[in-house]
Each structure stands twice: as C-alpha cells, then as structure tokens.
C-alpha cells in the first residue's frame, strides 16, 4: 500500500518546514509527498524551504513539487493536486497542519482493516493564540476545556485514489463520488493539529469573505 501525502501551499513556510520534517521522518519509504504551489503567488520563503529538502545528485528527492494557479477556485486546485498522486490512498494535509504521530504510524493498518471504505474523516484540533471572548462570540465558536475550537471539526482528508472521487465547489469545497465513508476515532491520537495566531485567523476570514 502506498499513501500520497498531498499538500497545497502558498505562504506557510514556517509551518510547511515543520510538516515536511515530520513527514520525512515518519512515513514509509514507499509513500510519497506531493507539494502543489500556488503558481504566481507562492512566496520565496516557501521555495527556499522546498529547496532545502532536495536530495544530493544521484539520489531520489523526497518531495514531488508541482505548480498550479489557485485563482480562488479551491476544488480545481485540489483536483489538480490529486491528479499528480500515484498512491492507493491520498491524505490531503494543509501546509499549516501537523498530524499526530500515532495517526501516521497506525494509518495503514486502519486502511487495511476497512477495505470497502472510500473516505475517512479526520478529527482536527484547532487552536488560536490571542483569541478573546469577543472573537469567540463574533464567530460563534465552541471552545472546550482544552481550548480546542469546534472539536472534533472532522475534515474530509483521506480518500481512495479513484477517478470517480473529486472535489467540487469553488469555495468551501466538498468531496463527491464517495459510496462509503468512515471516521477516524474521536481521539487526539488520530487528529490533525491546526494552530494559528489570531492575526492569521482574521486574515483568512477576510480572504474567504472576499471570494
């Protein structure tokens, strides 16, 4: 079994470096990491991070790097990323997210035990540093005792690599073509971590409002 870890990126160079260091260390050698840059908008800092992972001459690079313009159409962007993945499964991870180590370690065994499931939802731990009660009220967020926002915030991220499965909608994209789906356990050990600052959260909200 081969898993393609598919990562869209634009300007998240600090978070991307952490994610790539983690994946290179923990995934199987036959798996692949596919990075898709937002063509024309990806920052020089991101390219410097990607360059730092290049293998010496004669050795295989650990990353497959492609370019495609986002142009505000998230489904087209992710569908193009999917087309460059060769794995049996695709795990789409945003550049500013980080999987729990247990999720990566145990993922293949879970997939083997559920061969008829075509998509898995992944719980996500959202945290925002600098968050105030005013922000919470404004965005109507639910915060638990650990400071996690809208837990479990399940994300549709792990899919079989099938031609019938794709994303649709320009914004707030959804996966279609799924016959059977499941959810990873409601536990931190199976989660994605998604930390942000309040400044980045407000920039993101304003960006989505402009689309």
Model-identified regions with their sequence ranges:
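Catalytic-site signature of metal-activated, phosphate-bearing donor transferases
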Residues: 74-82, 98-211
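Short amphipathic alpha-helical segments
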Residues: 18-20, 47-48, 103-105, 133
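A general structural motif
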Residues: 2, 28-30, 117
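Short, acidic/glycine-rich phosphate-metal binding loop used to engage nucleotide
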Residues: 66-74
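Acidic donor-binding segment of Leloir-type glycosyltransferases
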Residues: 21-67
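Amphipathic, non-transmembrane alpha-helical secondary structure
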Residues: 17-24, 83
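Short beta-strand-to-loop acidic/aromatic patch adjacent to the donor-nucleotide binding site
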Residues: 87-98
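A conserved hydrophobic helix/loop-capping motif in glycosyltransferases and polysaccharide synthases
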Residues: 3-12, 19, 26, 36
């Amino acid at each position: 079994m081969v898993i393609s870890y598919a990562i869209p990126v634009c300007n998240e160079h600090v978070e991307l470096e952490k994610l790539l260091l983690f994946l290179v260390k923990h995934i199987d050698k036959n798996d692949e990491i596919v990075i898709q840059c937002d063509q024309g908008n990806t920052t020089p800092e991101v390219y410097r991070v990607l360059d730092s992972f290049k293998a010496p001459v004669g050795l295989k690079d650990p990353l497959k790097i492609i370019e495609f313009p986002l142009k505000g159409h998230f489904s087209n962007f992710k569908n193009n990323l999917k087309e460059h993945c060769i794995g049996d499964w695709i795990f789409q991870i945003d550049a500013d997210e980080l999987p729990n180590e247990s999720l990566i370690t145990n993922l293949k065994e879970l997939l083997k035990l559920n061969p008829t499931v075509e998509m898995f939802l992944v719980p996500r731990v959202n945290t925002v540093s600098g968050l105030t009660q005013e922000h919470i009220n404004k965005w109507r967020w639910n915060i638990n005792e650990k400071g996690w926002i809208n837990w479990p915030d399940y994300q549709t991220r792990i899919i079989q690599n099938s031609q019938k499965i794709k994303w649709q909608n320009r914004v707030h994209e959804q996966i279609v073509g799924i016959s059977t789906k499941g959810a990873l356990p409601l536990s931190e050990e199976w989660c994605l971590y998604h930390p942000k600052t309040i400044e980045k959260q407000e920039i993101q909200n304003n960006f989505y409002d402009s689309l």
